[in-house]
Curated annotation (Swiss-Prot):
Zn(2+) 1 binds at residues 159, 162, 216, 219. Pfam families: DnaJ, DnaJ_C, DnaJ_CXXCXGXG. The lineage of its organism: Bacteria, Bacillati, Bacillota, Bacillota incertae sedis, Caldicellulosiruptorales. It is found in: Cytoplasm. Homodimer. Its cofactor is Zn(2+). NCBIfam families: DnaJ_bact, PRK10767.1, PRK14277.1. A zinc finger (CR-type) spans 146-228. Gene3D superfamilies: DnaJ domain, Heat shock protein DnaJ, cysteine-rich domain, Urease metallochaperone UreE, N-terminal domain. SUPFAM superfamilies: Chaperone J-domain, DnaJ/Hsp40 cysteine-rich domain, HSP40/DnaJ peptide-binding domain. It comes from the Bacteria. Participates actively in the response to hyperosmotic and heat shock by preventing the aggregation of stress-denatured proteins and by disaggregating proteins, also in an autonomous, DnaK-independent fashion. Unfolded proteins bind initially to DnaJ; upon interaction with the DnaJ-bound protein, DnaK hydrolyzes its bound ATP, resulting in the formation of a stable complex. GrpE releases ADP from DnaK; ATP binding to DnaK triggers the release of the substrate protein, thus completing the reaction cycle. This is Chaperone protein DnaJ. Binds 2 Zn(2+) ions per monomer.
Length: 387
């Protein structure tokens, strides 16, 4: 039997090529050797068939895996056979035999074989398309109150020109010459258990019985195209960093008529210069003067809802907190909102006028330890420690 060319060599790609690289190589070669571009050229026609056969295997992850492991023998049981035996025999006994792969070999060997003497044509079942995951950054305010966003995504979709068939509109696929249109390859093969007749899915046409010789120019015969779409997303109020929104059916196109995959949007919340979120509560540090802290009074503070006024109690200490109910983050289930926690930071002036210094000295003279509880307790402990 003539030695088949390596599928990677046919498409001119390395063995570690990505699916996108394989698709690009196929489109370029299919255009170059297409029968319409080479009328009457038998060599170009054979080359075009080679290209389609190679792409049929390498574009399918499962077929590609088998090809990488077993080569052409993965799809043609008679490939490399000599006189009904096995190519090369067992020259080294069982020393070189990979028993770890025996399960795969056995599965391939008896694919399509029915122990009662009948066979059935296997077709690839519809499969769900792959899911897509993207990150979406929100401001803190957008995450708290919710919003609507529109994001671009790239995904594989069914070709609108050929309807996913891969055939140029107006053209029809031709009958597969390898299987005669049956979609199956029948062969006799010697095995460890005797001689068997096996029926396998045709690797040239993938079991459909036809070959696309006049591919759709929009998708290059793949039946799918890569497009950018803009998807609208409703962001619920109260969503947190790291949470995921799933849009069903917005992922990659389904395979063999299967449903589309899903789109998963992972939320990232940008840091806010003023507020910090902890669960459903918001925290903010508000600087106040030492006069505000000592005398108390009303001050204006920021919230995500706008400015509001709160009261500072006389004698407020640095780090004291006030909790404002219902000014935090909404609960996703609609059970109200968390709180806004205001932490007071007492700011001491670094520059004072002579008049201010004089007044503070008088204030110090009029002060007693009774007005400074922490200071009084500190010195009481010192005296107790050394008495």
């Amino acid at each position: 039997m003539a030695q088949k060319k390596d599928y990677y060599e046919i498409l001119g790609v390395p063995r570690n090529a990505t699916q996108e690289e394989i698709k690009r190589a196929y489109r370029r070669l299919a255009k170059q050797y297409h029968p319409d571009a080479n009328p009457g050229n038998k060599e170009a026609e054979e080359k075009f068939k080679e290209i389609n056969e190679a792409y049929e295997v390498l574009s399918d992850p499962e077929k590609r895996r088998k090809y990488d492991q077993f080569g052409h023998a993965a799809f043609d049981p008679t490939y490399g056979a000599q006189g009904g035996g096995f190519s090369g025999g067992f020259t080294g006994g069982f020393a070189d035999f990979d028993f770890g792969s025996f399960g795969d070999i056995f599965e391939d060997l008896f694919e399509g074989f029915d122990i009662f003497g009948s066979s059935r044509r296997r077709k690839e079942a519809p499969r769900k398309g792959a899911d897509i995951q993207v990150d979406l950054e929100l401001t803190l305010k957008e995450s708290v109150f919710g919003c609507e966003k529109e994001i671009p995504i790239y995904r594989t979709e069914k070709c609108s020109v050929c309807g996913g068939s891969g055939v140029r509109p107006g053209a029809t696929p031709v009958r597969c010459q390898k299987c005669g249109g049956t979609g199956q390859i029948r062969s006799r093969q010697a095995t460890f258990f005797g001689e068997f007749t096996t029926i396998k899915t045709c690797d040239a046409c993938g079991g459909v019985g036809t070959i696309i010789t006049d591919p759709c120019r929009e998708c290059g015969g793949t039946g799918t195209v890569r497009r950018q779409r803009r998807v609208k997303i409703n962001i619920p109020a109260g969503i947190d960093d790291g949470q995921v929104i799933t849009l069903g059916g917005e992922g990659e196109s389904g395979i063999k008529g299967g449903p589309n995959g899903d789109l998963h949007i992972r939320i990232k919340i940008a840091p806010h210069p003023v507020f910090k979120r902890v669960g459903q509560d918001l925290y903010v540090e508000v600087p106040i003067t030492f006069v505000n802290a000592a005398l108390g009074g009303e001050i204006e503070i920021p919230t995500l809802d706008g400015k509001t006024k709160i009261r500072v109690e006389p004698g407020t200490q640095n780090g004291d907190e006030v909790r404002i109910k219902g000014k935090g983050v909404p609960y996703l289930r609609g059970r109200g909102r968390g709180d806004l926690v205001v932490k007071f930071v007492i700011e001491v002036p670094k520059k004072l006028s002579e008049k201010q210094k004089e007044l503070l000295r008088k204030f110090e003279e009029l002060s007693s330890e009774e007005g400074y509880e922490k200071r009084k307790h500190f010195w009481d402990r010192i005296r107790e420690a050394f008495s």
